Amino acid sequence: QQANYRYGFEPVRKIAFSSAPPPRKPQERQPVAAEPYTSERGWGWLEGQAAVTLEATGVEGAVYGSRATGSAPAVFRIDIPAGHYYLTLNFGSATAATGPLTIHVNGEERLAGFGLEPGRFRALPLWVTSRGDAIDIGFSAAAGASWQVNALTLSAMGTLNEDYTLTRPWWRFEH
């Protein structure tokens, strides 16, 4: 059987939507503002980047210190090999509400009407499967409203041709 990772273990991708300087170490969170997607970089805004802005959240830190926001739908792409992943999205602000917003992953709606009150923060994990060479994460809000996201982390869980336990519940038994 042939694995579909580019490396022995696919690295964790950490993105913080901020204007901080580039990280000194590769495992640190990569700051991203409104950079468009390029295949050389392997990440960036695929659609809607012209309307993406950064706003402070009233707290310090790489994850929750600032966030990307937009009033028009936008799509963020990360190049990855096909496989199963945990996508953790971070939301919140000390000074303003978050959402309500809708999240699509590879065109599939994964979260609708999500929102937080000012002063609330949340890390939201999603199980995602990529059958291609990228994951596209879409952000949108109702007309006249804005979407927001602070950071994201993409962690590899397994390749598509690994053990079936990643896709089938182990507790299912035939009678």
Show where each model-derived region lies:
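Compositionally biased, intrinsically disordered or flexible polar/acidic segments
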Residues: Q1-H175
